[in-house]
Amino acid sequence: MLSSITTGLATGWRNLLAPDLAIDLGTANTRLYARGHGLIADEPTLIKIQPGTGAVEAVGARAARLSKLDRFAYAVSPLHAGVVADVEAASSLLKFFLSRAQRLGILRPRALACAPTDACEEEREALIEATRRAGASAVVVVPEPMAAAIGAGLDVSSPYAQMVVDIGDGVTDIAVIRSGALVTTSAVRTACSDLRHSVSQTIAFRYGALLFSEEAERLMRVVGASGDYERERLFLTQGTDMLTGEPMSICISSHDVVEAVEPPLEIIVNAILKAVRDLPSETSCEVIETGLCLTGGGAQLQGLSERLADATSLAVRVADDPMRAVINGACQMLKVGIATDIWNN
């Protein structure tokens, strides 16, 4: 009993001095959870660097706002296809968010960060390096689909295989989990950003207009993954005239959006279908029983779950909070990690 009291006191003091962190550094959004303090960041993964000086001008939501207010302001994501592409920019972005945790304590926090299953050693090291430069004293990297499955409420300790598909902004990550371990994994670096980019390119080519990113996102989500060419709908949206640079209104056909999203969407669906078909027979039988769970922003695409159910013949469900499944699961993994001291083990 004395041992448990001592452990509890030590954990409590650590939460005060240096709250440990769970990090979901995504291509589109970054989410940070501080042990004992809850979610301390849920903002766009954007950073605006001052031209010439290289100084950080804005981060996260503020960088996104500046981009909307000033068409010459240019904010970028330091991630590409789900992994860190610019360590320096990623560390500056994380440092801004980690400073909120360090205001809560006086020591450098430890961190648990999530990475796609297909991230190579160099890409994992880039994530670790960016997090350390940002102020973390130690970093451990965990697979995103495991965090997503836990955050979606799956019992990952079950002896029966369960499939989770996390469709983020930069990568679609597919995994089968059994008895607390990843049995099979596969990933394709085609995801929501590719759908959005394809919509923007199609509208630019056919209408001579540059779509605002949020408008491309809205069209993508409203039209969804149904592939419906039969029923045409018209959408009034806002963009910028490519010739004059002036704001303009455009009436866009749903057929254009369907045609735009189909190629990247087909890559995603085919990757999931291949992962299902490649399962060993015993695992396949278990997944038929347990079904497929969708997480990530792509899980909210209208008609996607039905399309995947038709393609795979599996029961497909969308997690209750798909956008936050990874960070919610990472929070739970952090609690276990603190108890087992994963940074030293």
Please state what every model-predicted region is.
Residues 1-167, 175-292, 299-345:
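Nucleotide/phosphate-binding catalytic cleft detector across ATP-hydrolyzing
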